[in-house]
Amino acid sequence: STWLEHGDQPVYSYNNHYWMPGYQHHSWNGRLDYEHKTRRKGERFTLSYMLALTRQHTDQENTYTELQNVSFPYTGSLMTERERFTEHTFQADWLRPLGKGHQLEIGTKYIDRNNNSENSQQFYGIDMNTSDEFHHVTRVLAGYADYIYNHEKWSARAGLRYEYSYMRGSYPDGKDE
């Protein structure tokens, strides 16, 4: 990289070599369902569990050579990023017929979500390193009730839903909490 002034005189210049010595990304998702049908026609009880996982690791390195009049005091850097995301979802649903064309559906759901990240940067040629670690938690609890009506080509649905969410983000070193 070269930045030129009027008259094509270089203000500064350097060569940059960039590469990624490490990169991994894994994502897993799964689901389990259990459904129980009762003796009553159309009535069922369902339990569900879902899992979502993501793991990512990235290393990015820059090295600078042939430095002339640069405004930075280092000769390169290594940036390391790590992310861990985990989400568990639990759900229960009950569907009960109330008569011909009428149904009641009641359910609840709980989500536990954790996201953690660590970032660091090492500078070459000077004694200066940076690092940040962040933890984020979200918990969601919800409940619902629906009335469902079906008649020939027509259907209608009315319901209520309540949802409560708790969120917290923190830096383990205590800064900016």
Task: Name every feature range the model reports, one short phrase each.
Residues 6-9:
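Intrinsic-disorder/low-complexity recognition with aromatic hotspots
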